[in-house]
Amino acid sequence: MSSGLKKKGLEWDLNDWRWDSNLFLATPSNASPSKCSRRELGRAEGEIDFGVVDKRRRVSPEDDDGEECINAATTNGDDGQISGQRGRSSEDEMPRQGTCSSSGPCCQVDGCTVNLSSARDYNKRHKVCEVHTKSGVVRIKNVEHRFCQQCSRFHFLQEFDEGKKSCRSRLAQHNRRRRKVQVQAGVDVNSLHENHSLSNTLLLLLKQLSGLDSSGPSEQINGPNYLTNLVKNLAALAGTQRNQDMLKNANSAAIASHTGNYVAKGNSLHDSRPHIPVGTESTAEEPTVERRVQNFDLNDAYVEGDENRTDKIVFKLFGKEPNDFPSDLRAQILSWLSNCPSDIESYIRPGCIILTIYMRLPNWMWDKLAADPAHWIQKLISLSTDTLWRTGWMYARVQDYLTLSCNGNLMLASPWQPAIGNKHQILFITPIAVACSSTANFSVKGLNIAQPTTKLLCIFGGKYLIQEATEKLLDDTKMQRGPQCLTFSCSFPSTSGRGFIEVEDLDQSSLSFPFVVAEEDVCSEIRTLEHLLNLVSFDDTLVEKNDLLASRDRALNFLHEFGWFLQRSHIRATSETPKDCTEGFPAARFRWLLSFAVDREFCAVIKKLLDTLFQGGVDLDVQSTVEFVLKQDLVFVAVNKRSKPLIDFLLTYTTSSAPMDGTESAAPAQFLFTPDIAGPSDITPLHIAATYSDTAGVLDALTDDPQQLGIKAWKNARDATGLTPEDYARKRGHESYIEMVQNKIDSRLPKAHVSVTISSTTSTTDFTEKHASQSKTTDQTAFDVEKGQQISTKPPLSCRQCLPELAYRHHLNRFLSTRPAVLSLVAIAAVCVCVGLIMQGPPHIGGMRGPFRWNSLRSGPK
């Protein structure tokens, strides 16, 4: 075998490429990529070329995939068998800086300075001194280990029984051989053990492929030989003469042709499921399953949200660079999944290329993927028309299954097992919503998330913002028993959207949790859901645990759905060409989001949803946007919830000046929600509020609308039976409601004279009130008060005292002397008559003869 690689290839730089997470397109960020992104093809003759380029981790040297797996397995000098420790970091076995001279091998235990140059070959090969091979506990990279005498390697301390020098797995194998346990009928323990060993060996092969870029020159030299040993062990475990042919040609073609056939021809690693032909196109139709009947809420506006789930699929493509992606990669993924994803986005990062695809699929589709991941990976390869999926090594993780293929042939399909102890679990993150253009301090709590083999990733907007080892982020102040806590800070751009926090181990298995980036008022409301998502506070003894888990699932589904909503809105707002613009958000899912926000009284979220709706971001199922909104009956829902803040927001919300209903001209702003809107049987929100006994605040909000429609409708709006909201309140005995609204009417509308007409022939009483307007003009408004359930058709009986009084008043009105003007005229006439009588009558004057006449008088003396 040649001396290894002549020249190390360098991994592509993430900063040299711009990745479109929606279109699945990679474009160089500069005119010419930097040297570190170019593939160097210098290889030695006769070398095994697995199509793997060497990698150089740019973010953190400790996270180098090339250092993760080079020493993950070793060859036993006695029998040639290979035993592997999954998930071990090769940094544990690399020489510690400053502990010994770099000219010779040294012990890998922390603080050990023993030079192994003069030690036995056994100690050199395993990089351990004689003392530490017999030690009960040693520390490697500050983690407790113990050297296994049978595996000839270090294992984590928890893999040993107390006082034992061999790990539990080796002891179990030894005990089975020693005791010769009789195998029950139908159970083949040896075959199960061989399958387990085969899986481990293939996984070690995967790790070795990831670790060809080890920094040590000796490791580069032994890399191809080490792969050959892995292939030999794989063939030995397969146990067939056909697979022994791989010993002759230890290259990728031989591995693909033989090992791929071993898996594909029914020798499944996990079950005896018959193989499904890959070449035939299978339609992803929903299987006939028993529908859930219990716990079905008839009032739920959107049931589909419970039947879809957002999850991810991870691919690791060896020997590939971003420019190897075809232009129709997104179309290939959608065709592979039979166009079932309703939403999809992707992220890439070096190593060689790790492609993470988040998608929203129906639950039945996720179940089909989990039931037979090997079939679906083979289908992806068979449908491909380019070399991306057909050449080189490809690792894929579909939910809890790992697959490995080479040159289009499937080699491995295995359920994922944790590297250390139990599986990882994210219990809670905070905050779940971050304001745009801000820096957030995240806290991640979980189980088994801080391990030597795990790292934390924070992704947003198609980019990886954080890639750090979890041990560096571990909060030392919270190292008590129980969940582990990771803390880190991250800055976000001014764009809104949805991101993920991932905890990943070196097997590429990872957990993720969503978070939202939006306006501050929107984030402050969404953060109120954190207590529902906190699994740390859940106690197994709680009676209502199932209800809490259901509420958590609903809140988590809202985060995913609102995240997809923000993603589509951002894409539509920033797309330069129509082809890049995705279709609008589905109306049914929008109704579910709106219903959830109204149920939680998220006023800022409702405003965000409505603004996007009027900007054309939703595919409506009706012609008019206003009609779509009014059909949701938001005011009625707010009144039934007795939510005064929500009513205040709805009554003051106006449409923006953005084009509505797809028209080119901007529609004028208008108030969408009014308190006098009529519902079934012409009942208004005022009628409903008047019937409740604890809705004084709600009624106060309904009568405080900007257009003053509430106080006008209080006595005028009638339902199908002719009753007003005031009648509803009076019948329920809510006099305080009547007094409150009447005070508003008196204070906001000027007082006027009231004329009352009483008639013996009328059956009703009419009140007419005249109000002066701001322009000093009077408008007459009639308030008809109907008492009783129905208006009686019989005339009411006349009052016995009213008839004589009316007749008396009528008689007095005809007597003119009672009027002051007539009396004055009579007095003047009487004076005139008296003067006339005096003038015409002959007065008797003493001393004069004859009658005295006025006309006989002379004027002046003679």
Curated annotation (Swiss-Prot):
Span(s) of short sequence motif Bipartite nuclear localization signal: 164-180
Cellular component annotations (GO), alphabetically ordered: nucleus
Function per UniProt: Trans-acting factor that binds specifically to the consensus nucleotide sequence 5'-TNCGTACAA-3'.
Name assigned to this protein: Squamosa promoter-binding-like protein 1
Keywords: DNA-binding, Metal-binding, Nucleus, Transcription, Transcription regulation, Zinc, Zinc-finger
Any Pfam family hit: SBP
Chain intervals with Polar residues compositional bias: 72-87
UniProt GO MF annotations: DNA binding; zinc ion binding
Residues that bind Zn(2+) 2: 148, 151, 155, 167
Locations listed in the record: Nucleus
Protein's gene: SPL1
Organism annotation: Oryza sativa subsp. japonica (Rice)
Superkingdom, taxonomy of origin: Eukaryota
